[in-house]
Swiss-Prot record:
CDD domains registered for this protein in UniProt: DEADc_DDX52, SF2_C_DEAD
Catalytic activity: ATP + H2O = ADP + phosphate + H(+)
Main location: nucleus
Annotated region described as Disordered, given as residue ranges: 1-99, 121-170, 318-355, 608-667
Taxonomic lineage of the native organism: Eukaryota, Fungi, Dikarya, Ascomycota, Pezizomycotina
Compositional bias segments (type: Low complexity): 77-86
Signal peptide coordinates: none
Motif annotated as DEAD box, chain positions: 394-397
Compositionally biased region (Acidic residues): 59-71, 333-346, 658-667
SUPFAM superfamilies for this protein: P-loop containing nucleoside triphosphate hydrolases
Residue ranges of the motif Q motif: 175-203
Organism this protein belongs to: Chaetomium globosum (strain ATCC 6205 / CBS 148.51 / DSM 1962 / NBRC 6347 / NRRL 1970)
Function summary: ATP-dependent RNA helicase involved in 40S ribosomal subunit biogenesis. Required for the processing and cleavage of 35S pre-rRNA at sites A0, A1, and A2, leading to mature 18S rRNA.
Domain Helicase ATP-binding: 224-447
GN (gene name): ROK1
Name used for this protein in its record: ATP-dependent RNA helicase ROK1
Length: 667
């Protein structure tokens, strides 16, 4: 017997509410695949083109339209004209390679999709040098004139420093085979995965990463550095825009090209690309996507494990302490494993610790710490990766954060090939992008991992047994074993787990296409953290997801960054809050929220909210609200009893003295 049906027997269903509920469910992110992978396609007018029509052209256009309309004849047997076009394309594929767009056409396409590509150079050092060599007579000028000249010079230098380029855009994945000479098997795998129209990041990145000389062939007037051996690349794109596929396709294509140039067989594997991800879940996802693209190519995409042995070059180095600082507490275990392997080589009886053969790897996907433990080697020595030609940092802003920065820099130093190319990918980047890439400096963001299991214990009893009970709630944190984390990820993707409690770092980049809602139990420490959290519901431009943020009185000063991000995204989507278009952030709310200084924002990133860091009332408890209320009432009753006893002790002697002074009734 269904108790809900019995209780609602006398209630008549409302057909309007059913229709609204049905319409709402179809708009959820889990409703299906997005038919439109591109987020932007703004109309951009042609540059330098006359808008006034000529007399001859004005008369010619209708004739062309009439000719196009006259071709639609259902009784005409002639079909030679439409059949001639595909035959010409098939007979002369070389013409499609040479056919490139002009710089003006590239500019229009890139701007219509809101794409901007710039060259990052060493201009700041030149600026410092010129400022130091200024003559003393120039510094004695008036303050007003000095400010004007300095502002103009800085603006000119800034424009020269941020030189914008317009490479060839990728309009369809079919161009990879003909224009950029991608392997036929790789092109077939891309088509088998259903990729037809590229997203914005794929449109701008793939031509530069596959063949930069071809992509920049039509660029004029740009001081382009030497890119014959590849180029370092930094990409900032929204979550769910296909960044994983964008850096995997050039990595696999580069392995195939170098294998063909060197004449190696498919059985000969050389480690040529390393993909670094901050979490194991994201690394596992990258491996799965890479193996789909590498079917039939002979390229092996492998996930780094502790027992994996790579072909490295071991050199003596007295400065191996840099590796020890980045490896952390688990470095000792890696050293013990390496020492155990060396001892096992001399012992014939112990078969479990025998030296393992070299792993056959072309593309290695890893997290920073496990690779660094392998590279640490013995004391006084370090291991290098001289064959690596491509180093890829996924979620680069986290890997260059002080939380992972030492480990990431140590891995970069281990890749000693002179032509190694570094590519960084993320959905958010700091404002000082150049300093982030060159010096690997970013403010630390340390997080408390204790609230994650505590919140899981708090929520696991809220789902009734009829719906699955505590099995519908799962927790994911770095203290768990790798096998347990993989099982939870598989259960969540299969729909067995409804609520997943996790942290910022573990949720970054992992593709959860069917997530309909995100609950921020704690206010994000920055706008970038909110973008990554809310991006779970908007993968590849899906609409209908809900992101709910809880905040307390202590969080009010830091809510404005989140509100600004929401307001900017709604403005970009054409949603107006005051006009009744469904906006969630009102103007009065933005004006009422206090402004936060940069120093306070820095402290928030480094130390978090002060009230939660100190503990006490802000900590998450596993007790129910009824138990907390009962304990609170009991504590208040005990406090009231103690207060009454103190009052009696204070009032007792005074009352006795007053009674002793009374002399009775007078006669």
């Amino acid at each position: 017997m269904d108790i809900l049906r019995v209780l609602s027997r006398g209630i008549k269903p409302n057909p309007k509410s059913k229709a609204q509920a049905g319409g709402a469910t179809t708009q959820l992110p889990s409703a299906g695949a997005l038919p439109r992978p591109q987020l932007f396609h703004d109309p951009v007018g042609s540059r330098g083109k006359k808008r006034k029509r000529r007399r001859g052209a004005q008369d010619d256009e209708p004739e062309g339209d009439d000719q196009e309309l006259s071709d639609v004849d259902y009784f005409a047997p002639k079909k030679a004209a439409p059949e001639a076009a595909p035959t010409d394309v098939e007979e002369s594929p070389k013409k499609r390679k040479i056919k490139l767009l002009d710089e003006d056409e590239c500019r229009q396409i890139l701007r219509s999709h809101r794409l901007k590509l710039t060259i990052l150079s060493d201009q700041p050092q030149a600026e410092a040098k010129t400022e130091a060599e200024e003559p003393a007579s120039k510094k004695k000028s008036s303050k007003k004139k000095k400010k004007e000249t300095e502002g103009k010079d800085k603006k000119d230098k800034k424009d020269e420093h941020k030189k914008q380029i317009f490479p060839q855009p990728l309009t369809s994945f079919g161009e990879l085979r003909h224009t950029y000479d991608v392997s036929p098997q790789l092109a077939a795998n891309i088509a088998a995965q259903g990729f037809r129209v590229p997203t914005e990041v794929q449109m701008a990145s793939l031509p530069l990463l596959l063949q930069p000389t071809t992509a920049l062939k039509k660029s004029e007037g740009a001081d382009i550095p030497n890119i014959d051996n590849g180029a370092d690349f930094l990409a900032v794109a929204p979550t769910g825009s296909g960044k994983t596929i964008t850096f995997l396709i050039p990595a696999i294509d580069g392995v195939l090209r170098r294998r063909a140039e060197e004449g190696r067989d498919t059985d000969q594997h050389v480690l040529e690309a390393v993909v670094v991800a901050p979490t194991r879940e994201l690394a596992t996802q990258i491996v799965n996507e890479g193996r789909k693209l590498a079917i039939g190519t002979g390229v092996r995409v492998v996930l780094m494990k502790r027992a994996l042995k790579l072909d490295v070059e071991e050199v003596a180095d007295e400065k191996s302490k840099d590796l020890e600082e980045g490896s952390g507490s688990e470095q000792g275990s890696g050293d013990e494993e390496s020492e155990g392997e060396e001892e096992s080589e001399g012992e014939e009886g112990k078969t479990s610790k025998e030296a393992k053969p070299l792993a056959r790897v072309d593309i290695l996907v890893t997290t920073p710490k496990i690779l660094l433990n392998f590279l640490s080697g013995k004391a006084g020595a370090r291991r290098l990766l001289p064959s690596v030609r491509s180093l890829i940092l996924d979620e680069a802003d986290v890997l260059l954060d002080p939380l992972f920065r030492k480990q990431t820099m140590a891995i970069c130093r281990a890749c000693t090939h002179p032509n190694v190319a570094l590519t960084c990918w993320s959905a958010t980047m700091a404002s000082n992008v150049e300093a982030l890439v060159t010096k690997h400096l970013l403010q630390a963001r340390q997080e408390d991992r204790q609230p994650t299991p505590a919140l899981h214990d708090e929520l696991k009893y809220d789902i009734p047994l009829e719906a699955g009970g505590s099995a519908r709630v799962a927790v994911l944190h770095s203290s768990m074993a790798d096998s347990a984390r993989s099982k939870i990820m598989a259960r969540f993707r299969a729909g067995e787990v409804w609520v997943l409690v996790t942290t910022d770092v573990l949720a970054r980049g992992v593709d959860f296409a069917g997530v309909n809602g995100v609950v921020n139990y704690d206010v994000p420490t920055s706008a970038a953290a909110y973008v990554h959290r809310a991006g779970r519901t908007g993968r590849a431009g899906r609409e209908g997801g809900v992101a709910v943020t809880f905040y307390t009185k202590d969080d009010i000063p830091f809510v404005k960054s989140v509100a600004n991000v929401i307001a900017a995204s709604e403005k970009q989507a054409g949603v107006q809050a005051d006009g009744g278009g469904g906006g969630t952030v009102q103007k009065w709310l933005l004006d009422a929220l206090p402004k936060v200084a940069k120093e306070d924002k820095r402290k928030l990133k480094v130390r978090g909210v002060e009230s939660r860091r100190t503990g006490g009332k802000a900590t998450i408890t596993t007790k129910s609200s009824w138990e907390r209320r009962r304990e609170h009432n009991r504590a208040q009753a005990v406090e009231a009893s103690k207060r009454r006893k103190r009052q009696r002790r204070e009032e007792g002697p005074a009352a006795g003295e007053a009674e002793g002074e009374w002399g009775g009734l007078e006669d």
